[in-house]
Amino acid sequence: MQAATLSFHPSAPPPQTSACHFSSKQPNQLKYSLFSYTCPILKRSLLSTQTLSRKSICKPPAVATGKYVREDYLVKKVSAKDIQELIKGERNVPLIIDFYATWCGPCILMAQELEMLAVEYESNALIVKVDADDEYEFARDMQVRGLPTLYFISPDPNKDAIRTEGLIPIQMMRDIINNDL
């Protein structure tokens, strides 16, 4: 039994079904062209030493598909600085912070529920969202490990904030706002 040799072919196109395949001319020679493949979106090699943010690589789908977290509607997208000002300032209503990402499926579902909640609690709660990719360091400081992550912050500074992670039902959000804040 002969061992297959691994060879790199810079001019070979990327395989259609797998990352490697056997050459029909030389059945024991494995062609592996992943290392030479230039990504058409990034216009550079996939193994470049240059680093890019996840947001530049993972573009959100077109708005026409409907499956996209909108930048602003009723629940406003805010920065880390805006959140810090909201937390330090005096409020008469609870603050709900949604840490999300545009590529996150559960975040898209949660965004729809939060928009409904924003209509329902229009003057009784302040709901904002933070893009965890745009505000990576702030999300890390807030111990966001999974998405979506919600923080429910009471207007009473003596009450602890409530943190949830993952998709939660709208009724649970109502219960937290009505009973725990």
UniProtKB/Swiss-Prot annotation:
Record-annotated disulphide pairs: 104-107
Cellular component, GO annotation: chloroplast; thylakoid
Active-site residues, record numbering mapped to chain: 104, 107
Transit peptide: 1-70
EC class: oxidoreductase
Keyword Disulfide bond applies: yes
Keyword Transcription set for record: no
Domain Thioredoxin: 71-181
Site (Deprotonates C-terminal active site Cys): 98
Main location: plastid
Any Pfam family: Thioredoxin
Keywords from the UniProt entry: Chloroplast, Disulfide bond, Electron transport, Oxidoreductase, Plastid, Redox-active center, Transit peptide, Transport
E.C. number: 1.8.-.-
GO molecular function, one term: protein-disulfide reductase activity
Disordered: annotated span: 1-20
Compartments where located: Plastid, Chloroplast
Family under the similarity heading: Belongs to the thioredoxin family. Plant CITRX-type subfamily.
Function: Probable thiol-disulfide oxidoreductase that may play a role in proper chloroplast development.
Protein name (database record): Thioredoxin-like protein CITRX1, chloroplastic
Organism, scientific name: Nicotiana benthamiana
Taxonomic lineage: Eukaryota, Viridiplantae, Streptophyta, Embryophyta, Tracheophyta
Gene that encodes it: CITRX1
